[in-house]
Amino acid sequence: MKTIGIDLWDGQLRQGGNAQTIMRPAVVPTIRRGIRDLFLENYPRFAPVCRTVEEPGIAIIAIDDKTARAAGVVKVLARVGRSVAAVAGRHDQCDLYLRGNDGLALRQFTVVLSPVQSWAPGAKAAQYRVIDLRTNDGMMDEDGRMLRGIRAEGPSILRCSGYTFFILALGDPTDYPQSATDAWDVMPERVYFDELEVCAGGSAAKLRLPRNDLRQSYIFRTQGPRETGVINHTACGVVGNERDLAGRLEIEGPNRRVILDVGHDALRDGVLLGRYGRCDASEALDDPSLSRVHALLVCENDKLLVIDTASYNGTRIIGEHRARVIELDRDVDLQIGKHTRMRWHWLG
């Protein structure tokens, strides 16, 4: 089965031209239907798609809050030994392409699915992370709390820019009974925590011991790519803490060369690359073939990944085909866009 399977519904047609980018103040979207109602009404649409999958993975289901109809589903299947990623947004290069709300960013968030050890029935469920791509509004959890990312193993529910997203586990067709009410009732309870590294109070004070009589899905709120300030086009800059440097990113475009020293915390949260002002070193990148938000450099499961965020001209190891996820396990030259090269060096 394909690593990423896509079903788009309700008028989400590609090649229709990408809507003009809209800059506006952050607002909290109005949810017209309750989350349970949205799930029950749309279950007959997405459940048959999910039942067909017997490999571990996740389904990302988007429901338009305005119409209360499912807009699409992306099935992301886990692989042994390598991460898989998918991107949601209003750009037609996105896997989960959504055009029903102009408030959604062209590239809203990426989902990174961790490798699995086995595909055998009963094996440990796939873990995943959702990372907001430094958008204006970010996301909300089902309790209405603003966030920039989550890490989870099990179902989660997110809301942003007029959509509700159900992220559900794949691999066991019996998780999707015929009755929508039964499916909702057996869905594990979502229990939210803050990661100790980014929460002043830590998560210990909020910790609830697991209950044997309940199925629970533990979700950790995380940070996303941070605002790192302006880096001028002449030389170099620092992303993160100078005293905790992880490595150096060298970017060479048609006329400019940029050096970014990146800290361990910044790598964990993610370093966003592209021509947009919300990306690191955007003022220094002079290649028009780069997308506004082109790639994400992030450390996941002790592996450094470059994730192409649905760019138009792609990301690739020089001499190879474009790829969505590239693991930097050695010194290697990458090409982003048509005329820009990039190399990572570990410093510590």
Labelled PLM ranges:
Residues L77-I157, G263-G337:
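Forkhead-associated
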Residues M1-G100, Q117-G122, I150-D286, T340, ...:
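Intrinsically disordered, low-complexity acidic Ser/Thr-rich regulatory segments
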